[in-house]
Regions:
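Nucleotide-activated chemistry modules centered on ATP-dependent adenylation/adenylyltransferase
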Residues: 1-230
Length: 230
């Protein structure tokens, strides 16, 4: 099952669940080496102004997709109707010939079971290129491939601080996180990233940093596109 989950995009057209962060970007890159991407799926919050997973603005999301060279299928959803909306998008991708869903999940079985369930209901196979790889290997490969990402969300209750916002994910910074007892991939929700360049991008995104926002135990750094990218 492990091997199948890693390689099910082999010689297939696939749809990628895309958050705009490091894990989904690396998974997309890996799948593109063996299969053919047809569309990105991005789930939005109820108002349809930001991504559901990372709180990323629509401008950034569309700029990422343009730089990658792929269209986006998106839907606004509450957590209550998230699954049904996601399945509808997956079913829509079949008209493009999609056979497989690619996700950036690493080792959380609950996420995998959910992914497999929506794939079964959509008659797609599931591909998780990063599945059960060592987390340090994943983030090191991400950086060494030339991806550039910025820390945009931190959980202040899990060892992260406001000073971490805006940090570029580098090998030196990852080592610092590990020394602080923080998972290098942020798999416990310690942090989220926004990818602004990498081998899947035809050109980098030029962004400016907004004012830090707070909500409960989270701090957020909004990113906006410079005028030339709009």
């Amino acid at each position: 099952m492990l091997t199948q989950w890693n390689t099910r995009a082999q010689n297939r057209k696939f749809v990628a669940s895309y958050s705009g962060g490091k894990d989904s970007s690396l998974a997309l890159y890996q799948a593109m080496q063996i299969g053919e991407p047809v569309v990105l799926i991005v789930m939005l919050e109820e108002q349809g102004l930001k991504s559901r997973s990372h709180g990323m603005s629509l401008d950034i999301i569309h700029a990422q997709a343009k730089a990658i060279g792929l269209p986006i299928y998106s839907a606004s959803a509450t957590w209550q109707d998230y699954q049904s909306q996601f399945i509808q998008l997956l079913q829509k991708t079949q008209a493009l010939g999609a056979e497989t869903l690619v996700t950036g999940d690493i080792d959380l079985m609950a996420h995998t079971e959910w992914n497999q369930s929506v794939c079964d209901k959509s008659e797609l196979s599931l591909c998780m290129p990063l599945w059960q790889r060592p987390r340090s290997d994943i983030v090191h490969e991400f950086i060494q491939l030339g991806f550039q990402s910025i820390i945009v969300t931190v959980n202040l209750n899990l060892g992260m601080t406001v000073e971490d916002l805006g940090q570029v994910l580098s090998l030196e910074y990852v080592n610092e996180l590990v020394a602080r007892g923080i998972d290098p991939c942020g798999e416990a929700g310690e942090f989220h990233t926004t990818v602004i360049d990498g081998p899947i991008f035809k050109h980098p995104l030029s962004v400016v940093k907004g004012d830090i926002l707070y909500h409960e135990n989270y701090a957020f750094l909004p990113l906006e596109l410079e005028q030339r990218d709009i």
